[in-house]
């Protein structure tokens, strides 16, 4: 989970319980770099690392389903908008007992980047995306 930190030679421990945050905290930060795969999206700023992922318990699956826009438009620019919304409509598969879409919208002077996360479960486990905001030790 710390590939972005390793790439920049930063030694910092991400603690999902201590550093739980809101995506709106990203507004006003200048983005240095971004790393993502289907289970993780990290944004490194000059002072913090913002990590979006899902801490799995048992019987759920949450993943980054789609990205609209150019992620590179975030790098080197200040975040002007950072919003989260969710929807419980239009499941990807039929027969899923419970599902949640989670959307993140980021804006810079260069454009928008939208993330679409999809979570499904048996109805007893969280399908939400965890947002962890960690202050860098410099």
Give the role of each language-model region.
Residues 1-138:
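Surface-exposed, interaction-prone regions used to assemble/regulate multi-protein complexes
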